[in-house]
Amino acid sequence: MSSLAKLGYFFDEKGVLKTEKDKKPFKFTTQEDYEELGEAVDLEVYELLETRCGLKRKALKLPGKTDEDEDLSFIFVSKNFKKAANLLVLIHGSGVVRAGQWARRLIINDNLECGTQIPYIERAIENGWGVVVMNTNLNESKDQDLKYSRTPVEHAETVWIACIEPSNAKSIYVVAHSRGGYDTASVLKKFGGDDRISKICLTDSPWFEFPKSCAQRARPLFVVNFLAHGALNSPSYKVREYREGNVAELWAGTQIHEWSSHCAIDAVFHILETEMTPSNYAEVMEEAKKLVVKSENSKESDDEAPKSKKICV
């Protein structure tokens, strides 16, 4: 697998992918070249998770197992993930994305800020939270299934058993994009009775449903889905009082699926950072509703993307 440097690319100081030769942004040539570049981006993001965010790459296996690391999938964790009082779990969607990414297309065509999970990770670390970054699409290597990670759901369940369930966290937060919502719901079927799981923020994920395991919880589980359709004041996004087992819906600040995690970040963290109870739920949700990053053009088309901040590297 080639590196970005070998392919003649680099991320500039604003996180924009440029060519080494003429310092111009990426331009599509062939699908084969694009896929090769995408794999190089995977490696670059992995490196940034370690060098910029201070995360540690961790082989994924069940406790007590002695499998060789090179035969396993892997995740990224913060140094304090076992001991932190608050633990943030990040789960990407389906397809080619890997740990640390929301959307490969945004990383290549826009910048690191909008396409990676780095802004979420850095904000969590600033708060003193522990961080676990799943890698649910890394299921095989050289056409061989990776043990404990043969499917996205098995990967997520193994991460939960190995890293999250035994942690000392008092509150566990999950942010999941797209298919990551299904993976989250699948995990909750087995672990949803854990009252430490307190808030789940989904970004444009239609696949989440409350499992029966959550019915006997002593502590409320707040779930919000930031959707990439409609607009801020659409009737469907009217804030209502808290109801147990309900998935609240808010506008993500965009009508483009892959932009939802980036545009909703301030609203997501307002929910995660605020002490939420059934009594103040509606107030917190109203505040979060107004924090989505909106495009200058409120009538976005598929080709119109919101403006994003830049991330320095």
From Swiss-Prot:
Pfam families: Arb2 (PF22749). Residues 293-313 are annotated as: Disordered. InterPro entries: AB_hydrolase_fold (IPR029058), Arb2 (IPR048263), Arb2_dom (IPR053858). Signal peptide: none annotated. Gene3D superfamilies: alpha/beta hydrolase. GO terms for biological process: regulatory ncRNA-mediated heterochromatin formation. GO terms for cellular component: nucleus. Residues 296-307 have a biased composition (Basic and acidic residues). Belongs to the FAM172 family. This is FAM172 family protein homolog Y75B8A.31. It comes from Caenorhabditis elegans. The lineage of its organism: Eukaryota, Metazoa, Ecdysozoa, Nematoda, Chromadorea.
